[in-house]
Amino acid sequence: MKVIIIGGVAAGASAAARLRRLDENAEIILLERESYISYANCGLPYHLGGVIPERKSLMVMGPSRFKAWFNVDVRTESEAVAIDPEARTVTVAANDRRYTETYDQLLLATGSTPVASDLPGTDPDKVFCFWTIPDMDKVIAKAGSGARKALVAGAGFVGLEVAENLRHRGLEVTLVGSSKQVLPALDAEMGSYLAQELLNTGVRIELGHKVVSFENDGSFRAVLNDGRKLEADFVIMCAGVKPNNELAAAAGLKLGPRGHITVDEKLRTSQPGIFAAGDAVEVLQPVSGRQTAIPLAGPANKQGRIAADNMAGLDSEYHGTLGAMVIKVEKLSAAAVGLTERQLQQLQMPYRKIYTHPGSNASYYPGGAMLHLKLLFAPDGKILGAQAVGAKGADKRIDVIATAMRCGKTAPELAVLELAYAPPFNSAKDPVNFLGMIAENMQKGLCESVYSETLPEGAMLLDVREPEEFELGTIPGAVNIPLGQLRGRLGELDKSRKIAAFCRVGLRGYLASRILKQHGFDCANLSGGILTWEAMNFKPRNTAPVPPPKKPEPAAANSRTLDVRTLACPGPVVRLKKEIDAMTPGEEVRLLAATSFAPDLANWVQSSGNELAGMEMKEEHLEAVVRKKSAPTACSLSASAPAPNSDAAMVLFSNDLDKALAALIIACGMAAAGSKVSIFFTFWGLSVLRKNPAPAVKKTLISRMFGMMLPAGARKLAL
């Protein structure tokens, strides 16, 4: 048997190696138009950033070793330019000559190619793709030639990895994405965690825009569709890929609607003796039951193996691609499997969803990290998709769910999966078990969930967190009754009104909803709590890179140390406040906490007026020094009063009548002293300016909800 394989990377190399193991006597020719075969193209961004220091590490196996190990006739820089299915021949172009090879079986593993930039003003010395080793070499040379600014067009897998690694090289990086989110393989709210991570490292993000042309008048600029011009020393185009289908189309093979090669479960094409595998083929999506294209290395390698089995006479089938994926963005990992909520809506498939934010391991064991999980399932319990983002354990949970999906398990059945447990690795109830338990409660009617984007109109928002947490910020209009006080304060709630209970992550909100339901209230839990609400309302804010806080100085022998690494919310905030309250002004405490506590720490320090004297993000926790604010010093009225004719600004954030009056009195006094005074009314302070009765104004759902939560004008302010 003579087999020709066209394409020598993932699917092609896998097929050649498998075929040789099955048939020692087969004649196998591997044609590759580039200079390299069997290389780690998924590792290219990490060599760009220096994470993989040695270029040769990317070469999984060179042509000579592949020949020695597998006795395969490897022909690099040899391009298949034509196929004759009737004569079973392939025409090859190599070294300025053409020749023809016959075959008994043929495998097309031609892969995919980045969508090329044919935009006006494209300069090949400044606009690059990033797909092959030669592409990578060009970008590394450009980045190392004194370049300071880079622009990455495309916010998918490759775009995110390239942006991150260019930043590691010290370049100023702008990431432009045509979608309103990063990584469309996730839903927008789940991708928001990755966007914020990139912003934290200094990457500038422009979403909902695309590059439409380039200008070069001595300064190279990318022109966006809104007319803005972004200066860059070079641009990397990562705006998607297309299948390399030219050979297949010319040979008369059947193609799908997007140009991918159509294959059956044995990876046979429409022409006898021709198989296809990898990025160029159309595959079954088992969840939707429809054909699609999912260009991932894992499926490509498996398809190459299965195609080889069938060419060798074995009976192997490929049962579709669920699309299990994972990506690293700085300290976070994101993983997903199945369909997204957006895809389910497009397909008009009914679904239910769950958000939860558990820890990666037992809360009492140091080094854990928060996971953001989303599960999508059908009304009958069939798992439709899942997404996970976090510093630890995202891949593990999605792997478990992907396996459950392949085995036909339902969402409630995730609750009974027996998964390995020890405190350094997990909690006794794995986060996947939690998802199953929540799904089971929903299926049995024990838990009604509401969602940030579809809050019932007129619902009361009940924040059941502790007062110290509430002070850090909440959903506008929410009322705070801590969970521990709820049973004793039921009289403050209205049974005629829908209640949406929430906490930070969802657990206490669920407990509150169970209490209230059994006391006759119409109550639901806000799925995912305030963390999911924040993710739903995320908008990237590009600011000048802020230098990281200085590293904490070595602690003095008699200094305080507060270790809250093993405390779940609200423990860290409550313990820190208690510690600070017991300290004298100017005294410092060395704080050890989980890395996920960083945003809450920054908010608490700002709202409390204390000082973050230093902070360092370590591998598995953060270390910070918090200094208690100094006591106010006495001063005379004349010393504290503003100078005449100076400007002053005040922010009114409250809807308390006494605070509003105080702000107005102070402003009038300062104006009488000759100062120019501005008052900014924001959030609840907007109540002072509201007209009553209010004029008819067309508003969005969120705006209407916000309006219902505010007092109806200055006369409705409470003390």
Positions of PLM-derived features:
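Mid-to-C-terminal Rossmann-like scaffold of FAD/NAD(P)H-dependent oxidoreductases
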Residues: M1, A280-K392, P423-S427, P431-A459
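Beta1-alpha1 glycine-rich phosphate/pyrophosphate-binding loop at the start
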Residues: M1-D73, V115, A163-L186, A324, ...
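A Rossmann-like FAD-binding core segment of flavoenzymes
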Residues: N25-E27, R75-A94, E101, H168-V263
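N-terminal glycine-rich dinucleotide-binding loop that anchors FAD/FMN and/or NAD(P) in oxidoreductases
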Residues: G43-R75, A188-V211, L339, T543-A555, ...
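Rossmann-like dinucleotide-binding cores of NAD(P)H-dependent redox enzymes
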Residues: M59, K149-A150, F157-S213, I294-A300, ...
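Glycine-rich dinucleotide-binding loop and its adjacent helix/turn
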Residues: L108-R169, R204, V263-E265, V479-L483, ...
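FAD-site-proximal beta/loop scaffold in flavoenzymes
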Residues: D123-G146, G218-R221, R228-D309, V400, ...
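Rhodanese-like catalytic fold shared by cysteine-dependent sulfurtransferases
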Residues: P412-M460, P467-A500, R504-L567, R575-K578, ...
